[in-house]
Every structure is written in C-alpha cells, then in structure tokens.
Amino acid sequence: MSATAFPTLSTPAGEIPATAPAWNRQRRSQMPSHRYRDVHSRVAVPLTDRQWPTRRLTEAPLWVPVDLRDGNQALAEPMDPARKRRFFELLVAMGYKEIEVGYPSASQTDFDFVRLLADTDLAPDDVTVVVFTPARRDLIERTVESIRGITNPVVVHMYTATAPTWREVVLGHDRAALRALILDGGREVLRCAGDLPTVRFEFSPEVFNLTEPDFVLEICDAMTELWQATPQRPVILNLPATVEVATPNVYADQIEYMHRNLARRDSVILSVHPHNDRGTGIACAELAVLAGAQRVEGCVFGNGERTGNVDIATLALNLHAQGVDPMIDFSDIDEIRRTVEYCNRVEIHARHPYVGDLVHTAFSGTHQDAIKKGLAEHRARAAARGVPEREIDWRVPYLPIDPADIGRSYDAVIRVNSQSGKGGIAYLLESEYGTVLPRRLQIDFARHVQQHTDDTGREVTAAELWSLFSAVYLREGEADAPQADLGNRLGIDGVVASGASAAELGAALRRHGVELEVLAVHHTTVTGELLALVEYRDGAGVRWSAGRGRTAGEAVGNAVAAAVGPATAPARAVAEVRPG
C-alpha cells in the first residue's frame, strides 16, 4: 500500500531500536508518548508479597448495578422517569439485591425516583437502595431528605476525589485540608442519617488508583472509626479506578494492600468500581476480587462515562462459564438487551461479549467444522446417557457457554460467507432442512458455494444455500431434465427404462446406451420428504446428483434422472452401488 493512501497518517520512519530482535522491524513513531508518565512514577504500591495471583474465583461477589446513577449521568439523553422505572424493574427481576438508584441532590428526576421507592412497593423488601452524594452539607441534607420513609435497607454513598491532581487542580486542597473536608462530610452524614436504623454508609475515595496508598488508608480508617463500623453495621469502602491508568495487576496490588492493612477489616465491605479507559475493566474487577474485594459496582453491558463502567453482565457470565453460579439470571439475554437499549438509547455492539448479535456466530470454515462436530458429539453423549442435552457437561469448541443458557437458539451459530467451509454449509442444511450431506458431497458443494460467495461478496442464508443446492444437484424445473414416476419408470429422451433399485436403474441405463457408473447412494430428508444423494462417474469425472420422492425408490429414480441429464460424454462403466 502506498504511503499516500492515508495522507493524514504518518507512517513510523524512526530508527529501529538497537535492542530489537531481527524479526521485529518496527520503527519509532512520531506519537508524542514522552508527554505521559507511567503509573509507577505517579503512585507507589507498597506490596511485595502479593497473594492474589494464586487465588481462584469460587463465588460471586455482591453485584451493585449503578446504571441508574453513574450510567445515567453518561447518557446524552438521561433516562426519563418511565425509563428509570423500567430499568429498575429489570434489575430486580434479574436478581440484583443492592442497586444504586440515583443522585437525588443533583436532579429533581432522581429525587422524585427515590421518593417513588419510598411511596410504593416497587422495591422488594430484600433490595438495598443506594443513593449518591458529594461531601457537602446541603447536598447531604437533600440526599437524606429523599430517603426518609423508605423501609428498605438504604446505603448513603458519599464520595470525594483524593488523588494529587484532583486535590491540587480541582479542589485546591493539600492532604490535611482534604482529610478535614472528608471527615466533615462524614459527620454530616452521621448527623442527618445516623439515627435511621435501616441506613448504612459507603465512602469512595474517588480516583483511588492514583492516590497515595498511605493517604487513602489513613482516610478510610478515619471514616470507619467516625461511622463506628461494626460487623453488624459494616461500612462499605469503595475503591474506584475512576480513570483506568495501569495494567490490571497494579490495581489488584492496590486492592490487596488495602485488604490487608485496613483497620476494622471484619467491619468493612471492600468494594471496587473499575472503569474501562484501557479496555481492561473486566480484568481489573476479576483480579480485584482475587485480591480481597467483596463487592463490585458497574453497569449491565458497561455503559458509563468515556469508555464505560465495568460490565457486570460480562463479569457474571464469566463466572457462569467457569461453573460458578453468578447469582443473577440471564436466561433471556435478548430481553435484557432490548430493555437496556431502550432505557439508555444506546445500541449494544454486535461483538459485545455474550450479548452481541454475532458472539455465538462462526463464519470461519475451521471454526464451523469444529462447532458442528462438537454439537453432534454433545447430542450423542446426551442420548447415550439418556439425559437431556441441557443437563450434561458443555464442551463444544469455540462456544464458551451453551447459547441456550441465555435464551439463544443455535440458529445463528453458523453462518456462511466466503470464509466458510464445508462444515458450516452442512450444518445449516442439516439444522434448517434436516438434510445430512455425506463428507464427499460437502466438499463438492462447498466449491459451488465458494464460487457464489466470491461472486456476490455476501453472506449466504440457509434458504439461499438450499436454492443453490437444488440448482446444482436436483435440476428440478429444467426443460430437458428427465422425470421419474412412482413406479421408477425413467424417461430419457423418449426411451423408457424400468428399475426398482439404483443398481437396476444403472443397468437399465447402460442397456439403453447411457454409460453411468453409480458409486454410492445416500438417503436423507429435506423438510420431511425423502431425498436420495447419488455419487456417480461419467465422462466428466465423479459427480453428484439428488432426487426427492415420497418413497426411497422414487427419490433414487429422480436422483439418477438428474445425473443422466448432464451426462454428455459416455464412458465405459460398470454399475456398482456401495452402501452410503
């Protein structure tokens, strides 16, 4: 490709680093990377004997969807009351037991929604309601006003940014002044809501992942002391990766440091809130749970500011795929998707994990062949054990989970385009029409499909595959195509031969001067009708034909008739029928 094809790009033309191996010919680019500092020069992580790498995920953390607050703030068009209510009802139906419902001091819509929960039975008794507030007296008072009368458990979630850049540039405070501001906010929360028996408290040191570990530990310990955290009334300490800045192992180290050094650890629910700026929010959350986190905040399908909050649906289904109960129901993921798209007015990408339109779809020929064989083995194993297919271990290649677990069918698992092979083609014909092609016919038909997709550049549907198959092998509707009746009388250019089997038909053909060697006959069906597949040799080489019928004899007769039609170069032949 010429350098002028993309004139807005500057192809790297610097030197090849002296340390680069001979096989790596990348050159230094013109990207201004020198403007940025790596995370290790911005914040220290005093953890050297980390334990999280040897741990395993064996149970789900407490999932806390923040779609109605954090996710809602990120929408170009925030949810109206009807959409907020619909989303809340979805979260309850899925099984979430702690839901952040809004920022009542920031908007009247959020305040009114919290009051709706107070005035109705929309929130089941076992669902905890979380409300969000900055550490400001007037906003804390407004927040607590919104929750009065709610009989459900309530969490008042207070936050303040603590990282150096935020302290100095945004808030204009040093460490001591910010500590005082946070504790003043904590006292206001205690003054306004401390006597409410169903209320617990949560604190988030915003931008935790860029805050000095000793400072954030000092503040968190001061908050749990102020709020008198006990095992009976634990405090949630939520540690956000507000802007993702490092590889997930760094965040895991930071979480483990807090987990191992917090005071009153048995009275703390350690929570995380990863974002996805580097595209590794999922990994950050999973490693954080290994490191000691017990609670994860995020959004269903990952909506949120910039590149989004961590996707708690993907996190849950990752556990499901490892044999761990996610404690949330995804049995109709397409209904969940429709609701989330309606409420957020944001479409979900076709490749989004688990929920995207194409995540269970294979176009690649090698993938299709493996999936087809895996599904066949799965069915056979279930039949051999005499148990339903849904009850045996899932081990189909390229499909991490059974699509049926989340309400998907197998209809879209295999789709055919120019990258596809015989396995996918055969699978579609079998799944849509009940037609099982023998391997040699799969190979032959794949050549015709490849030519068709190369010519059109389009995906081929199952209906189009069958139309192409009919044109190539059945030859139905052609003016010169011979026909066979129920008695297997074969008309070839006015010459009538009779036969009750493929071998006899072949012999009859030879008696009338048609040299056709029948190599094999296979029997299958097409939408309930009998279908015969005949492999034969004529002057043009080895070929295939097909015929439909109400009886096996009629189907075979029609298949031989279709074979005779294109036979133009007679060759010496010996009639032979081999079992298919």
UniProtKB/Swiss-Prot annotation:
Pathway the protein acts in:
Amino-acid biosynthesis; L-leucine biosynthesis; L-leucine from 3-methyl-2-oxobutanoate: step 1/4
Q: Where in the cell is it found?
A: Cytoplasm
Catalyses which reaction(s): 3-methyl-2-oxobutanoate + acetyl-CoA + H2O = (2S)-2-isopropylmalate + CoA + H(+)
Q: Identify the EC number(s).
A: 2.3.3.13
Region annotation (Disordered) ranges? 1-37
Q: Which domain of life is it from?
A: Bacteria
Pfam families referenced in this protein's UniProt entry, alphabetically:
HMGL-like, IPMS_D2
Record-level GO BP terms: L-leucine biosynthetic process
Question: Which cofactors must be present for this protein to function?
Answer: Mg(2+)
Pyruvate carboxyltransferase domain location, by residue? Answer: 61-334
Alphabetically ordered keywords of this record: Amino-acid biosynthesis, Branched-chain amino acid biosynthesis, Cytoplasm, Leucine biosynthesis, Magnesium, Metal-binding, Transferase
Provide GO CC annotations from the record. cytoplasm
For the ligand (Mg(2+)), the binding residues are: D70, H273, H275, N309
The residue ranges flagged as biased composition, category Polar residues, are 1-11
Molecular function per GO: 2-isopropylmalate synthase activity; acetyl-CoA C-acetyltransferase activity; magnesium ion binding
Region annotation (Regulatory domain) maps to 476-580
Q: Which enzyme type, at the first EC level?
A: transferase
Which Cys pairs are S-S linked? none
| Gene3D superfamilies according to UniProt | 3.30.160.270, Aldolase class I (3.20.20.70)
Summary of the function given for this chain in its UniProt record: Catalyzes the condensation of the acetyl group of acetyl-CoA with 3-methyl-2-oxobutanoate (2-ketoisovalerate) to form 3-carboxy-3-hydroxy-4-methylpentanoate (2-isopropylmalate).
Q: Which family does it belong to?
A: Belongs to the alpha-IPM synthase/homocitrate synthase family. LeuA type 2 subfamily.
Subunit notes for this chain? Homodimer.
Protein known as? 2-isopropylmalate synthase
Q: Which organism is it from?
A: Nocardia farcinica (strain IFM 10152)
